[in-house]
């Protein structure tokens, strides 16, 4: 049963909708960031359902927004960057250095670029089917951020 679950959402989407295989290496870093933004948001919302429980949706949304904003993603990549393989670091740097035609509303250019790199990495890992690695990196970032916050308060 576990294997059929990890057959995964991506495969189910492709099979049911009749989509072709996508090679993440052939996608632009901004396209990787586009899908990475969504998958990171989904992982964080799933995490919050467990850690915050059944609460008002607007409160859950505030918690999620605080974690998925560019500044937090920039902090998270700073935490996990030493854990990245050379290939993962290359994807992150491609995303960070990509020329974006949009700008952050509430973040510095530096944070926005680092967040774009983080999202590109998440998108790459997701499309490669490396879900466990993606979630391990997110967990490492969340654990460290939570320890820092706990020490402050």
Short names for language-model regions:
Residues 1-153:
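Double-stranded RNA-binding/processing signature
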């Amino acid at each position: 049963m576990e294997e059929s679950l990890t057959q995964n959402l991506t495969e189910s989407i492709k099979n049911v909708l009749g989509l072709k295989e996508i090679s993440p290496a052939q996608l632009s870093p901004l396209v990787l960031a586009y899908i990475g933004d969504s998958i990171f948001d989904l992982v964080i919302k799933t995490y919050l359902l467990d850690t915050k429980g059944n609460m008002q949706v607007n409160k859950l949304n505030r918690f999620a927004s605080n974690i998925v904003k560019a500044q937090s993603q920039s902090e998270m990549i700073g935490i996990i960057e030493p854990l990245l393989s050379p290939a993962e670091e290359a994807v992150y740097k491609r995303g960070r250095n990509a020329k974006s035609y949009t700008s952050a509303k509430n973040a510095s250019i530096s944070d926005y670029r680092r967040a774009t790199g983080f999202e590109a990495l998440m998108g790459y890992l997701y499309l490669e089917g490396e879900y466990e690695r993606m979630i391990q990196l997110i967990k490492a970032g969340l654990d460290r951020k939570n320890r820092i916050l706990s020490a402050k308060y």
